[in-house]
Amino acid sequence: MNKKIILTGGGTAGHVMVNLALIPKLKEQGWDIAYIGSHQGIERELISKVEGVPYFPISTGKLRRYFDWNNFKDPFKVLKGTFQAYRIIKKEKPSIVFSKGGFVSVPVIIGAWLNGVPSIIHESDITPGLANKIAMPFATKICVTFPETLRHVKEEKGIYIGAVVREELKRGNADKGRTLCQFEKGKPVLLVMGGSLGSKRINDALRANLQTLLDDFQIVHICGKGNVDPQWTNKKGYKQFEYVHEELPHLMAMADIVLSRAGANSIFEFLALRKPMLLIPLSKEASRGDQILNARSFEKSGYAEVLMEENLTNESLRNAIYHLYQNKDRYRQNMDRSDAGDALQKLLTLIEEARKS
């Protein structure tokens, strides 16, 4: 009985986290696992830390909705990546392929289809991203996080499973988080996350308010690669990280409130941990608008406050943080009533049912 699976997904941490949640569970069930990603994406760094999962890099190009000279050469990179993925899948002979999206996943899903191997795509956002839109016709099943997404998917392919949250996030230890950051017990903690690539506007507005905010909060700031500010390195009550992985559960456990972008994976993790959140979604100028839809959905459900990037100023950020903290108990009560089912188990069952025997 062939129980081999190839995972794919990359470009941002959000396109890898579901795979990281799946891997330990798949191992428990006796699956042989491999990963196809890009040569230099964040997925390579994250998966390289996972024991027993060989990584196969392929060529990939970004598919854009706007004019860029790279639009003329990137399709050839995608074509090259498709041939590479086809050969890898032909050699590895998986019984199923699972994709979390991102541009590297398009060649892999097409490569699986060319080999007659079933594939499953997981779409986190309310509206499918461009990569998943291209890959969907070649996939066997498409899992969605938001029920609203089903209207964008063929009825016979779409399955609503909810959000997949990593089990280790639920095992965070607040005391370990405080030790890591040299924070004291009793003073509220604000966790700031600008996404795996960081956010200059959020970083700048936060640091402009640090002197005031540190009177009332301890702040752990995940600011993105190359964005640590040496001016604040030794400031008491303020801890900066470029990026965190193993430490994240402990940092989340000690946080009282969260300031974040509105990527679907992250906000559902905050929901699972009952962390009141202030969301600053990427603007439509900088994205396709998916984070705005995610944020508005959470705002409507009473899980989050939303500050649009075009309204982001030093003053508006400071006021929103204090307002969130003052109303944190109401947000937690709303989260307690949320319907957060076991999406991970649903996904594992679907993988087992869809695989090629």
From Swiss-Prot:
It is found in: Cell membrane. It is a peripheral membrane protein. Coiled coil: none annotated. Signal peptide: none annotated. It comes from the Bacteria. Pathway: Cell wall biogenesis; peptidoglycan biosynthesis. One of its GO terms (molecular function) is undecaprenyldiphospho-muramoylpentapeptide beta-N-acetylglucosaminyltransferase activity. Cell wall formation. Catalyzes the transfer of a GlcNAc subunit on undecaprenyl-pyrophosphoryl-MurNAc-pentapeptide (lipid intermediate I) to form undecaprenyl-pyrophosphoryl-MurNAc-(pentapeptide)GlcNAc (lipid intermediate II). This is UDP-N-acetylglucosamine--N-acetylmuramyl-(pentapeptide) pyrophosphoryl-undecaprenol N-acetylglucosamine transferase.
